[in-house]
């Protein structure tokens, strides 16, 4: 089979040879037959990830309430804070979730955390279309999935994480999760800014589809 951009299965992209190797259920195996070769994270490490970051401070408007933020609410927040997202921007969503984890001082309360802080509504088709139309280059949050997980209930098919499907599979937009954004968000708001230089190289892991990043904001 030929994937998007003309990459070929079994050559540039190798899937698992056994379902147990997919890592979707249970423990992830120590070894894997999966490799993305041409699309490995090492390519991002070699070129680095650097450009204009744009902070959207959801926490400033919503606090730590568990809310699935759809298109309408996101647009109101952008308008109120005079935030403009342009083509090529790396968009960061500050929800306060990572800050909550740190405040629990290595004793996280799972029940509290699973009912805390905002996340994007991946089922909102207008929100997904905005991601496409805006031309943003990366979507990053300080929560564990960027979008609400489990996703908002709906009728019909299909994706468990629809925003992941839209960004990663359809558009090739990388996602960042569990970044500690609160100190930066507080500084930007106190200086009436939303933009900064973001440098966020991943680790050079040949064939891997993801990696921890080492992000630095220059203000």
Regions found by a protein language model. Give the residues of each.
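Active-/binding-site microenvironments in catalytic and ligand-binding cores
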Residues: 1-219
């Amino acid at each position: 089979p030929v994937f998007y951009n003309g990459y070929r299965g079994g050559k540039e992209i190798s899937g698992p040879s056994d379902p147990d190797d997919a890592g979707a259920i249970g423990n992830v195996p120590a070894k894997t037959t999966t490799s993305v070769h041409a699309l490995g994270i090492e390519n991002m490490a070699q070129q680095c990830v650097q450009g204009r970051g744009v902070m959207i401070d959801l926490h400033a408007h919503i606090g730590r309430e568990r809310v699935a933020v759809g298109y309408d609410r996101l647009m109101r927040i952008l308008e109120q804070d005079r935030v403009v997202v342009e083509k090529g921007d790396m968009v960061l969503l500050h929800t306060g979730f990572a800050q909550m984890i740190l405040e629990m001082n290595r004793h996280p309360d799972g029940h509290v955390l699973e009912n805390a802080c905002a996340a994007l509504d991946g089922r909102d088709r207008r929100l997904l279309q905005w991601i496409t139309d805006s031309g943003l280059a990366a979507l990053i949050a300080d929560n564990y999935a960027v979008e609400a997980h489990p996703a908002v209930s709906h009728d019909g098919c299909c994706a468990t994480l629809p925003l992941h499907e839209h960004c990663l599979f359809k558009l090739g937009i990388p996602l960042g999760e569990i970044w500690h954004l609160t100190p930066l968000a507080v500084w930007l708001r106190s200086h009436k800014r939303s933009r900064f230089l973001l440098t966020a190289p991943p680790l050079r892991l040949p064939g891997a589809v993801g990696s921890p990043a080492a992000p630095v904001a220059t203000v």
